[in-house]
Curated annotation (Swiss-Prot):
Its cofactor is Mg(2+). The modification N6,N6,N6-trimethyllysine is found at residue 4. InterPro entries: RuBisCO, RuBisCo_large_chain_AS, RuBisCO_lsu_C, RuBisCO_lsu_C_sf, RuBisCO_lsu_fd_N, RuBisCO_lsu_N_sf, RuBisCO_lsuI. The disulfide bond which can form in the large chain dimeric partners within the hexadecamer appears to be associated with oxidative stress and protein turnover. It catalyses: 2 (2R)-3-phosphoglycerate + 2 H(+) = D-ribulose 1,5-bisphosphate + CO2 + H2O; D-ribulose 1,5-bisphosphate + O2 = 2-phosphoglycolate + (2R)-3-phosphoglycerate + 2 H(+). Heterohexadecamer of 8 large chains and 8 small chains; disulfide-linked. The disulfide link is formed within the large subunit homodimers. It comes from Idesia polycarpa. The gene is rbcL. The basic functional RuBisCO is composed of a large chain homodimer in a 'head-to-tail' conformation. In form I RuBisCO this homodimer is arranged in a barrel-like tetramer with the small subunits forming a tetrameric 'cap' on each end of the 'barrel'. The keyword Chaperone does not apply. The active site is at residues 165, 284. It comes from the Eukaryota. Binds 1 Mg(2+) ion per subunit. This is Ribulose bisphosphate carboxylase large chain.
Length: 465
């Protein structure tokens, strides 16, 4: 058969509704908005083609390989209820299209080119099914939830954190002082802000030294293990690893990375270093909203969360459901489960398009932070459960009496909520009452309750199904 040149419809090759998906396929659910006049099958097939083996015309070299073995296939298309001209296109990719252990390569293939495609008005990657055959090629989180609890000797409750503010402008010594006050008051962790790297007003090495001093002082006073997320994010991978090495030499328990701005390659390198050297790794998701906020275009955060679990991190920010930053309850809980659990059933009501089996990849602790304070504690304890980190930045440092009393207020509120829950009380219904009772015994908590009694951040949720 001679080579037949020319342009042919994608759907002739890449739309295969009778395809049976394999256990080793990577499956993707795309929300496709075709341009007017483009049939959904053609749009779905175009996505499958452009994100796998296809190009815009048939090429002579197609004859030198087996397209059937390597092509992505659009195997199902369904209209999105309540939206006109939006479809969910399901695409199956053969495992051999991807380099083992590389989130970078996976994303370059699946979302690399296709989002600029002219036949589509908009495109969003809603979910990915990562087969065990692929996830087993990743180290995953450096330590995971259980090992972290064992290292810190903290069980049966969420962990408490605080981002040091003002995020930019403090000198290293004053920064360390703020860290010490928070940890002394009863927090488990304090945190570098995501944009604190190594700036003229505070170089990274000075900050690391003063924070380590604060850590050890607070540890000696409280008898509890303390941590400060030292942000190792830097302009080059080598510099990032250098900072992580220095943190390890100081003997601190945890470092931090901005995984989207730093990039998956850097993040995976750091995760490997952290496992090899006994450091926990806290992950911040700066830049995520650029990618995930639009309903019809981009990548949903649940995909970025799955990618992080593969690349590696022990904590990741995941919205609060109640604070100042976005997060719809069911959907947020959907990807919180994807981060923590071994096996997650498909559940479209929570935005989970595929059953995901992580086999034994360690879990990641979700971090709730952003505009939360003591009155939110019952809701947060109920929504996130024990395996989470609750971070109060302004909710600690904004306390009228200072950082340490702010930390005391949060710790008392948390312990009261955990105790009430363990006694079988309903946090959703009696939450305010529980906090009020506890504040009778803690003047610090009473003062915090007074300051924030009226604060609410209420807007319509953007992320609905």
């Amino acid at each position: 058969v001679g080579f037949k040149a020319g342009v042919k419809d994608y759907k002739l090759t890449y739309y295969t509704p009778d395809y049976e998906t394999k256990d080793t396929d990577i499956l993707a659910a795309f929300r496709v908005t075709p341009q007017p006049g483009v049939p959904p099958e053609e749009a779905g097939a175009a996505v499958a083609a452009e994100s796998s083996t296809g190009t815009w015309t048939t090429v002579w070299t197609d004859g030198l390989t087996s397209l059937d073995r390597y092509k992505g296939r659009c195997y199902d298309i369904e209209p999105v209820a309540g939206e006109e001209n939006q479809y969910i296109a399901y695409v199956a990719y053969p495992l051999d299209l991807f380099e083992e252990g590389s989130v970078t390569n996976m994303f370059t293939s699946i979302v690399g080119n296709v989002f600029g495609f002219k036949a589509l008005r908009a495109l969003r990657l809603e979910d990915l099914r990562i087969p065990p055959a692929y996830s087993k090629t990743f180290q995953g989180p450096p330590h995971g939830i259980q090992v972290e609890r064992d290292k810190l000797n903290k069980y049966g409750r969420p962990l408490l954190g605080c981002t040091i503010k003002p995020k930019l402008g403090l000198s290293a010594k004053n920064y360390g002082r703020a860290v010490y006050e928070c940890l002394r008051g009863g927090l488990d962790f304090t945190k570098d802000d995501e944009n604190v790297n190594s700036q003229p007003f505070m170089r990274w090495r000075d900050r690391f030294l003063f924070c380590a001093e604060a850590l050890y002082k607070a540890q000696a006073e409280t008898g509890e293990i303390k941590g400060h997320y030292l942000n190792a994010t830097a302009g080059t991978c080598e510099e990032m690893i250098k900072r992580a090495v220095f943190a390890r030499e100081l003997g601190v328990p945890i470092v931090m990375h901005d995984y989207l701005t730093g990039g998956f390659t850097a993040n995976t390198s750091l995760a490997h270093y952290c496992r090899d050297n006994g450091l926990l790794l806290h992950i911040h998701r700066a830049m995520h909203a650029v990618i995930d906020r639009q309903k019809n275009h981009g990548i949903h955060f649940r995909v970025l969360a799955k990618a992080l679990r593969m690349s590696g991190g022990d904590h990741i920010h995941s919205g609060t459901v109640v604070g100042k930053l976005e997060g719809e309850r069911d959907i947020t809980l959907g990807f919180v489960d994807l981060l923590r659990d071994d096996f997650i059933e498909k559940d479209r009501s929570r935005g989970i398009y595929f059953t995901q089996d992580w086999v034994s990849l360690p879990g990641v602790l979700p971090v709730a932070s952003g505009g939360i304070h003591v009155w939110h504690m019952p809701a947060l304890t109920e929504i996130f459960g024990d395996d989470s980190v609750l971070q109060f930045g302004g909710g600690t440092l904004g306390h009228p009496w200072g950082n340490a009393p702010g930390a005391v207020a949060n710790r008392v509120a948390l312990e009261a909520c955990v105790q009430a829950r363990n006694e079988g009380r309903d946090l959703a219904r009696e939450g305010n009452e529980i906090i009020r009772e506890a504040s009778k015994w803690s003047p610090e908590l009473a003062a915090a309750c007074e300051v924030w009694k009226e604060i609410k951040f209420e807007f319509q949720a953007m992320d609905t199904l």
